């Protein structure tokens, strides 16, 4: 295989806008802007923020989000998970106006997909081969499917968790070779030569390195904050009227762009340092308490 030049891949990778000028004008019409002038757009991370690591959502969190929407504020899911990995009906039963997924690489509003960043297939192939060369185990993440080779995760509980949670949406990298449609990649990195891998792929991706041995490979220039900025542009909303709740490294990007960043009490210290306000942990009514403090409810 010829080595792929990253600048070619980045320029050539398709960015899909699925909203019309008319729709954008509709969302941003003057009357609505006046009505929303004192209202906020609130973005919620999922893991460690809306629910704990057992997928348990506090009743107070559900009440808080429903109450803030009743008060005229908008609520969005904003996750590093790709859309294929956001399927739990308990999440959507809470009620959200839209979804920012895949670290800003996909945006939905009102049940419609309005933005999607698709990675070039040649770049994906090159990246899979490169991360494996350095001892990483990749999971390819798209809007419809995740791709993982089971042999690489046979002794890993995470692989079993994925299979249990998304079932038929989990496909095999090898079986779908060259037919992937994805927007980001995550890699297990326990025994990997990480620095050499990052150096080789640094022109193509930004890396979100977690405390657990996992790294997210996100298209250069994309993160949750860029997704939020696109939402604000499409809604004709001032970004200072945004609030974000999060707990992990991939939430720092959104804390740096929103009006107010709220770190959960269970956040890592580096995340708390980036936040404007630190609430209690997810299972100690953290979202409810912060929403009360910020006068959203």
Which sequence ranges carry the predicted segments?
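N-terminal amphipathic/hydrophobic targeting modules at extreme N-termini
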Residues: 2-20
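Conserved acidic, metal-coordinating active-site core of Asp-based
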Residues: 14, 130, 134-245, 249-254, ...
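Mg2+-dependent phosphoryl-transfer enzymes with acidic/Ser/Thr/Gly-rich catalytic loops
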Residues: 37-41, 58, 216-297
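Asp-based phosphoryl-transfer active-site loop
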Residues: 40-54
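Active-site phosphate-binding/coordination module
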Residues: 54-154
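Short active-site oxyanion
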Residues: 72-76, 95-97, 183-185, 240-242, ...
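Short, structured coil segments at secondary-structure junctions
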Residues: 92-95, 102-103, 200-204, 257-258, ...
């Amino acid at each position: 295989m010829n080595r792929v030049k990253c600048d070619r891949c980045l320029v050539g990778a398709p960015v899909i806008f699925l909203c019309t000028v008319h729709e954008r004008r509709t969302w941003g019409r003057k009357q609505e802007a006046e009505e929303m002038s004192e209202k906020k757009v609130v973005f919620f991370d999922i893991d460690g923020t809306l629910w704990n690591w057992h997928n348990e959502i506090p009743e107070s969190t559900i009440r808080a989000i429903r109450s803030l929407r009743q008060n005229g504020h908008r609520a969005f899911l904003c996750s590093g998970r790709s859309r294929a990995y956001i399927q739990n009906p308990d999440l959507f039963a809470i009620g959200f106006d839209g979804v920012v997924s895949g670290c800003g690489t996909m945006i939905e509003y009102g049940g419609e997909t309005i933005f999607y960043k698709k990675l070039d297939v040649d770049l994906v192939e090159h990246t899979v081969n490169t991360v494996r060369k350095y001892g990483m185990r990749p999971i390819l993440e798209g809007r419809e499917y995740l791709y993982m080779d089971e042999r690489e995760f046979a002794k890993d509980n995470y692989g079993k968790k994925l299979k249990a949670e998304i079932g038929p949406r989990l496909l095999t990298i090898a079986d779908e070779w060259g037919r992937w449609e994805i927007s980001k990649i995550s890699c297990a990195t326990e025994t990997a030569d990480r620095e050499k891998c990052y150096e080789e792929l640094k022109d193509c991706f930004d890396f979100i390195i977690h405390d657990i041995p996992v790294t997210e490979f996100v298209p250069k220039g994309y993160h949750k904050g860029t997704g939020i900025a696109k939402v604000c542009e499409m809604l004709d909303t001032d970004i200072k009227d945004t609030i974000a709740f999060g707990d992990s490294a991939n939430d720092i990007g959104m804390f740096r762009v929103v009006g107010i960043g709220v770190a959960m009490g269970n956040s890592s210290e580096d995340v708390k340092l980036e936040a404007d306000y630190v609430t209690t942990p997810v299972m100690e009514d953290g979202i409810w308490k912060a929403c009360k403090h910020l006068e959203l409810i």
